[in-house]
Structures are given as structure tokens and as C-alpha cells.
């Protein structure tokens, strides 16, 4: 059984990962039932999460398993919200408390234990590169979207080969210089991140 950090994260968060896929709005999206209002609210909830994650990783690049600039999602989320809601989305759409709390957790990690940002990068970015690609196709079909308009969140223009990027991301996790105790903390923080995602998905249930 592989014992690298990437394998540990996958193995030891598997139960929470499955729970997240069945939680709130995500359960409906993965079943192909896409409610536009709920989906826009999901993007609104995730926006501050990515803003904080990307700001924190830019300040602590050693915590990033891969180039976070290539994977940054905040600008894509802003573009999708502008397309799906309108240019006044940031003013007109209320922030989702569960998303604000998730972002606050990332900020606290950045201040108190920056290396643990790797856990949040793992949960969000590797998810976006993996199941997120299938989710994007379901959303596009459900909302009758064509091309990248409203779908920027699922497109990675700086990534030429998604499969290779995922392999490099996992290798980057394994190369981070964590002690055994620190690796345990990263796994624990990934569980926190999955729990935060579950709360977001439940908060924007259809």
C-alpha cells in the first residue's frame, strides 16, 4: 500500500470525500439536476474560498504542491458569476456564511501553520482537476452552456495535460518536506477542508 502523502490523503479522507459527493447541492449536480439559482449560489460561496487560498499560497509558495498560479480559480469564478448572474454579482449576491467560514479557516491556517495550506490545495485543486471535469460537463448540459461562457471554472488554460498535471500535483505533495507528525496534521487539515466543503454544499442545497 503506497504510504506517500498523496496516497494517505486519498485513503484517509475517502469517507468524507464520499459524503461530500452526496451533500446538498452536489448530490443534485452529480445526478444531472442543475438548478441555475443554486449553482450560482454555489459559485458565490466558493469565490471567497479561492480568493483566500490563492492569496495565502502566493504568500507561502513553499506550501503549494504545484504552481498555484496555473490552477488559480478565483478569476474564473468571477467570470462565471458575471456571465450567469451579471456584472453586479459581487454586490447583489449575498455571501454564503459557510463559504465565508471556509475562507476564514484558510486564513487562520496561513497565519498559524502555513504548511497546512497544502491540505486545502489538495482538496480544492485536485478535486477540480478530477471529478470537477465530469461535473463541468453535467453543469454545461444542465444549463445549456456551450464553450467557455459560464464554464471558465472548469477550464485550465495553463494546463496542457490534465492527467500529467494531477500526477505532478501528487508528486509535489509527496516531495513536501514534512515530518511524520506534520504529515498527520496535513491529513487532519484535509478532513477539516472536506467538512467545510460539505457545509458549503448543504448551505446551497436545491
Residue ranges and their predicted role:
Residues 1-206:
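Metal- and O2-centered redox machinery and metal/ROS homeostasis
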Amino acid at each position: 500500500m503506497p504510504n506517500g502523502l498523496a496516497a494517505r490523503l486519498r485513503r484517509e479522507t475517502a469517507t468524507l470525500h464520499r459524503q461530500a459527493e452526496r451533500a446538498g447541492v452536489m448530490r443534485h449536480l452529480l445526478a444531472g439536476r442543475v438548478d441555475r439559482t443554486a449553482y450560482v449560489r454555489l459559485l458565490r460561496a466558493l469565490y471567497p474560498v479561492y480568493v483566500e487560498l490563492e492569496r495565502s499560497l502566493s504568500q507561502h509558495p513553499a506550501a503549494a504542491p504545484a504552481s498555484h498560479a496555473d490552477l488559480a480559480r478565483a478569476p474564473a469564478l468571477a467570470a462565471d458569476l458575471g456571465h450567469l448572474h451579471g456584472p453586479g454579482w459581487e454586490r447583489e449576491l449575498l455571501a454564503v456564511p459557510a463559504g465565508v467560514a471556509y475562507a476564514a479557516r484558510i486564513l487562520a491556517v496561513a497565519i498559524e501553520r502555513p504548511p497546512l495550506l497544502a491540505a486545502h490545495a489538495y482538496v480544492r485543486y485536485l478535486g477540480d482537476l478530477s471529478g470537477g471535469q465530469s461535473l463541468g460537463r453535467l453543469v454545461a448540459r444542465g444549463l445549456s452552456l456551450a464553450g467557455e461562457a459560464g464554464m471558465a471554472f472548469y477550464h485550465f488554460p495553463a494546463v496542457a495535460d490534465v492527467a500529467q498535471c494531477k500526477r505532478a500535483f501528487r508528486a509535489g505533495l509527496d516531495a513536501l518536506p514534512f515530518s511524520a507528525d506534520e504529515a498527520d496534521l496535513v491529513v487532519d487539515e484535509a478532513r477539516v477542508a472536506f467538512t467545510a466543503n460539505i457545509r458549503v454544499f448543504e448551505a446551497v442545497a436545491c
